[in-house]
Each structure stands twice: as C-alpha cells, then as structure tokens.
C-alpha cells in the first residue's frame, strides 16, 4: 500500500505491483484497508477531514515504548524525550518553492488549542514527555490559535519545552514573548 504526498502529487509514478493507493487522508479508510475490505489494485481518494478535533487520539502505546521510538531531542534543549505532533494540515500560503499547496490545496485545517493541550497533558501524564516539536507546514497560520495555546499551556502549569516550524514574517515580538 502507498499513501502520503507522493501518491497525490505523482500518481502516475506508482508501480503497478502496489496493491492499494490512498490519495488524501487515510484515517477513515485505514481500518477497512488493513481488514481487506477493498479489492486489490484500488486507488482510494478520500475527502479532506474538516474538523481535526473529531479524530480520536492516536494509540500511542503502539509506538511510544518501542526500541525505534518516536521520541526525539531538540538541539537547544537538554530535556528529553521530545514528542513530534502534527496539529494542522496544509498551509494557507502558496510559496513558489513549496509543494504543500500543490498536494493539499490551500485549505488549512487545524486542531483547536484545547485539543492540543489535552493531547499534551495526556502525553505528559502517560509517557512523561519533556516537550513537543510541532512538525507541520505552518504552525502559526492562525496567530489566534497560537496565542490561545500559549495561554492554556501557561495556565495549566505543564512544564514542557516546545518548538515549531514557521516563517520569519509570521511572528512578531509579542508572539515570541508569549511563546
């Protein structure tokens, strides 16, 4: 089975020996795919999930304590483990050097600040994470969401470090201070 950005951007390059291809988001088809519901050779084109808060929390037990763990470090922090999170999809921008809008379109969707905090508190309580790295295309696409998340993190007194990916022109001094 193939999935991910490649299947959307370059569907003609997928080898014929591949049994299944998912173009789009797989959360609502993955169980049926693994369960053999679809015939071999099918290309599944899924709709965009509009409300990312509606997705269930991932079953972190499947991978958090494995030998090849999804726990990372950050170069500027001695604290670990750091857990990667992806709380949004796509990007509202269309930078000439980037393929994100070609793959996802410019329909940016995101989890709410409340959902993100809930997941962070869960990961802190269950796995004692030291921090989070928001691995997504454009974390501060909604400054309002970033401010709200920062306020919730401060109010909750959760002791973590965190980092995100952004553009220099997307942040200002006020946002940096609360982050």
Go through each PLM region and give its residues.
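Glycine-rich beta-alpha loop elements in corrinoid/cobalamin-binding modules
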Residues: 1-56
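Radical SAM [4Fe-4S] cluster-binding motif and immediate context
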Residues: 60-179
């Amino acid at each position: 089975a193939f999935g991910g950005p490649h299947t959307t951007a370059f569907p003609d390059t997928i080898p014929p020996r591949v049994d299944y291809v998912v173009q789009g988001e797989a959360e609502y088809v993955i169980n049926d795919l693994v369960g053999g519901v679809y015939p071999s050779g099918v290309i599944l084109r899924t709709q965009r999930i509009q409300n990312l808060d509606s997705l269930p929390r991932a079953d972190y037990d499947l991978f958090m304590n494995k030998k090849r763990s999804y726990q990372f470090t950050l170069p500027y922090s001695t604290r670990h483990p750091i857990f990667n999170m992806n709380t949004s999809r796509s990007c509202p921008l269309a930078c000439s050097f980037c393929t994100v809008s070609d793959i996802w379109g410019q329909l940016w969707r995101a989890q709410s600040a409340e959902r993100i905090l809930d997941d962070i508190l869960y990961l802190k309580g269950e796995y004692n994470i030291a921090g989070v790295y928001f691995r997504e295309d454009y974390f501060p696409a909604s400054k309002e969401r970033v401010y709200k998340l920062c306020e919730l993190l401060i109010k909750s007194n959760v002791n973590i470090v965190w980092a995100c990916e952004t553009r220099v022109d997307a942040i200002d001094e006020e946002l940096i201070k609360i982050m």
